[in-house]
């Protein structure tokens, strides 16, 4: 349903944000 799609997008977004945060910390 719509809820599971939202959860999926949330997880993807969280992963992307975490990756970018890690990149910024490495610099």
UniProtKB/Swiss-Prot annotation:
UniProt GO molecular function: toxin activity
GO terms under cellular component: extracellular region
Pfam families: Cu (PF17563)
Keywords assigned by UniProt, alphabetized: Secreted, Toxin
InterPro entries documented for this protein: Cupiennin (IPR035164)
Subcellular location(s) per record: Secreted
The organism's place on the tree of life at top rank: Eukaryota
Presence of the UniProt keyword Zinc in the record: no
Record GO biological process: defense response to bacterium
Cell membrane is among the record's keywords: no
Tissue expression remark: Expressed by the venom gland.
Similarity annotation: Belongs to the cationic peptide 04 (cupiennin) family. 03 subfamily.
Protein name: Cupiennin-3c
Organism: Cupiennius salei
